[in-house]
Amino acid sequence: MIDAPKKNLVKQKPIQALKKQLLLNLETPIQIDPKITTAAGIDMRALLVTELGSYYQGSRDLLKKILDIDPLYAPKAVNYYSLLTDKLIISTVENVINLIHPISNPTNSEKICVLAVGGFGREQMAPFSDIDLLFITPYKQTAWGESVIESILYILWDLKLKI
């Protein structure tokens, strides 16, 4: 009986460090270095897929390690998984609009709203579940808007997400 608390303390120290790292991942923005984006011959879509994929896989690995140590963390992990996916979607949209399809003077027809629906929208997303997104555009959509949505979807598909 005396050894049991020691074992719990040993298990809690690594899990606390993992949880801190997970929170840090959620708080740290996913940004592409502006120096890289201006270099000639850079395939921005491939760069985004690499950077976003690295972030997402690293964060998922952290969640898996936490769950391996503490299976009772599952309800929180579902919320964190949704938040990580949310951050990935937001970063994808922002980077596509700012780096791949920048527009200096957008009109009212060049606006896009992305909504999360289903389990993802409720922040109850299980690992490997599909991601339900709703794109809302103005009645008169432009070629720019179609290109942005297409690029967002291709990047998310390249990340092996089920959209």
PLM feature segments, named:
Residues 1-111, 128:
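N-terminal regions immediately upstream of nucleotidyltransferase
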